[in-house]
Amino acid sequence: MSRVAIVTGASSGNGLAIATRFLARGDRVAALDLSAETLEETARTHWHAYADKVLRVRADVADEGDVNAAIAATMEQFGAIDVLVNNAGITGNSEAGVLHTTPVEQFDKVMAVNVRGIFLGCRAVLPHMLLQGAGVIVNIASVASLVAFPGRSAYTTSKGAVLQLTKSVAVDYAGSGIRCNAVCPGMIETPMTQWRLDQPELRDQVLARIPQKEIGTAAQVADAVMFLAGEDATYVNGAALVMDGAYTAI
């Protein structure tokens, strides 16, 4: 059955893989991204075969007005919202360091995108899902939701909050036919991580900490999302699907 999915941060990396996977199975997608130009380029290079099934919406996920307008546009275009994938996120300044050297502005920015953005997305779609009596929300968290990343206090804090928000939504709406789960990826090769993985020494350092000795792919993240959004996961609710090559198992 064809569904309507909203994917934030849809123009590259994990978001692109997720949105494309929905489209490939015949679903309609509202693709949200901060840059209208990047969305247009992505549509031209990756989604030309699905032109009638994609709604491109420029939106800042941390802006309530943008998010509400994007949800309204999706309802107007497609008439339903079956799945929300809160994928948009930022890591923050890699030089921010430990907590006492992290600028307040940097902390606020990371929390605004990574936590407020998911809160606003959930808040905007839930009334529609309640009316439908069904819906699925998948939040892209991180292994940093489970273990602290050294020198990344803002990012680690934000991803911990994402996991707790996921559980809160699951508990509050489980009786209404709505499921909410999180995907917790480890190191995934995307444009966001490419600067590190392109440096052989840093790549080796990353691989040394992963028992499986592999870097994950955006396609694998999309696999996890499709499982949680699908009929094989109807009793999975409030869960964290960890995909990290056993990184957090040691």
Swiss-Prot record:
Q: How does it assemble?
A: Homodimer in solution. Homotetramer. Component III of the aliphatic epoxide carboxylation complex together with components I, II and IV.
Positions bound to 2-oxopropyl-coenzyme M: 152, 195-196
- Which residues does the entry assign to the active site, renumbered to this chain? 155 (proton acceptor)
Q: Which residues are annotated as site, described as Lowers pKa of active site Tyr?
A: 159
Q: What does the further note read?
A: Enantioselectivity is dictated largely by differences in kcat.
The entry summarizes how activity is regulated as: Inhibited by the arginine-specific modifiers 2,3-butanedione and phenylglyoxal. 2-(2-methyl-2-hydroxypropylthio)ethanesulfonate (M-HPC), an achiral analog of both R-HPC and S-HPC, and (2S)-2-hydroxypropyl-coenzyme M (S-HPC) are competitive inhibitors. Inhibited (at 70%) by the coenzyme M analog 2-bromoethanesulfonate (BES).
Identification of the protein by name: 2-(R)-hydroxypropyl-CoM dehydrogenase
Q: What induces it?
A: By aliphatic and chlorinated alkenes.
Q: Quick one: which residues bind NAD(+)? A: 12-14, 33, 60-61, 87, 188-192
GO terms for MF:
2-(R)-hydroxypropyl-CoM dehydrogenase activity
This protein's encoding gene: xecD1
Site feature location: Transition state stabilizer: 142
Q: To which species is this protein native? A: Xanthobacter autotrophicus (strain ATCC BAA-1158 / Py2)
Annotated signal sequence is none
Q: Which UniProt keywords apply?
A: NAD, Oxidoreductase, Plasmid
